[in-house]
C-alpha cells in the first residue's frame, strides 16, 4: 500500500513565542553562479511574506562580492568550514555532491530553535511558515522519486519500483529482502538545530562509507527512524511532472525544486530532455519574474531625525524581533 501522506498538512495554529527563534537556511559554495539561485530564493520568501530570515551558510571560497549581494538582500551570512567524507573511490551521481556534506554544519546553528533548509535551486511560491509549527522531535521532508536515470544503480530503478506509486510494482521481498525505508529528497527539510546531534553527525560521517547521493543518502540513513513525509507541494522535484503527474496539482505547489538536468532558471536553454515542456517553461518564467522584480529587493529602514520616525522605527524593530527576523552583529571596537 502507498504510504499515508495527508495531501493537506494540518499543523497547530500559533506563532513563535517565549523567545523561540526560527529561520530558513540554505547553503552556498564556490565562485559560480549559484548565488543567483540564493538571491532568487531570498526574494521569493519575501514575496511569500515569510516572517523569518534566510540564513546562508557559506564556505570560505564564496567571494566577498557574492556575500555582499546576499547581505544586500537581507540574508544572514554565516561562514562554515567544509565537511569531507572519508577518502574513497565512490563516484558520486554528480561530482559536486561531495561538497554537500558541509550542509551538516547547519545543525550547529543552535541560536535558532527550528529551521527549514532549502537548496539554492529552490523557489518558494507560497508561504510555508506554518511548517515551523510541526511537532518537534521529527525530521520532515518530501519523498523522492526513483524513476530518473540518476537512480539506475539502485534495485528500485532496475525493477521499476518507486515509492511514489508503490502499488504499481510489488517489491520482491523473497528476492531482494525487506522493502527499503521511505527515502526523502534532502533539498528541503524541517529540522531542529542541536549540538549533540551536530557532533554525532560529524562523528558518524567519518565512519560511514560515502554513497552515490552523498549527504542525501547519509541523512536518510541517520534520520530514518524519525523521518515523517510531508506532501510533495513542499518540494516539487521536477521529474514528478513527467513521472508521476497523477500525484501533482501544479496550482497547489508551494515550493519548486529546479534540480532536473537543465532546469536551473539562470542557466536554462530548454535544450535538455524534458525542458521543452510547457509546464517547465512556465515554472522557469515564474522564477525569473521574482528574480527580476526590483520591488522585492530588501529595503533597509532609514533612520529619520524626528521623534515620530524614531517611534516608528522602534515599533518596526520590535516586530522583527518578535518574528525572529532581526540579527544583531557586534561592531568592532574603535579603541
Swiss-Prot record:
* One Gene Ontology CC term in the entry: cytoplasm
Q: What positions does UniProt annotate as the active site of this protein?
A: 103
**Which reactions is this enzyme annotated as catalysing?**
myo-inositol + UDP-alpha-D-galactose = alpha-D-galactosyl-(1->3)-1D-myo-inositol + UDP + H(+)
InterPro entries on file: Glyco_trans_8, GNT1/Glycosyltrans_8, Nucleotide-diphossugar_trans
The alphabetized list of GO BP terms reads: galactose metabolic process; response to abscisic acid; response to cold; response to oxidative stress; response to salt stress; response to water deprivation
Molecular function GO terms recorded:
inositol 3-alpha-galactosyltransferase activity; metal ion binding
Query: What cofactor requirement does the entry state?
Result: a divalent metal cation
User: What tissues harbor this protein?
Assistant: Accumulates in mature seeds.
- What is the uppermost EC class here? transferase
Q: Superkingdom of the source? A: Eukaryota
What induces this one? Answer: Induced by abscisic acid (ABA), drought and high-salinity stresses. Promoted by methylviologen (MV), a superoxide radical generating drug, a superoxide radical generating drug.
User: What compartments host this protein?
Assistant: Cytoplasm
Q: What keywords would UniProt list here? A: Carbohydrate metabolism, Cytoplasm, Galactose metabolism, Glycosyltransferase, Manganese, Metal-binding, Transferase
Q: What is its EC number?
A: 2.4.1.123
* Positions that bind Mn(2+): 119, 121, 257
Q: Which residues form a coiled coil?
A: none
According to the record, the signal peptide region is none
| Biological function | Galactinol synthase involved in the biosynthesis of raffinose family oligosaccharides (RFOs) that function as osmoprotectants. Promotes stress tolerance of factors such as drought, chilling, salinity and methylviologen (MV), a superoxide radical generating drug, by mediating an increase in levels of the endogenous osmoprotective compounds, galactinol and raffinose.
Family indicated by similarity: Belongs to the glycosyltransferase 8 family. Galactosyltransferase subfamily.
Question: By what name is this protein known?
Answer: Galactinol synthase 2
Per the UniProt record, the source organism is Arabidopsis thaliana
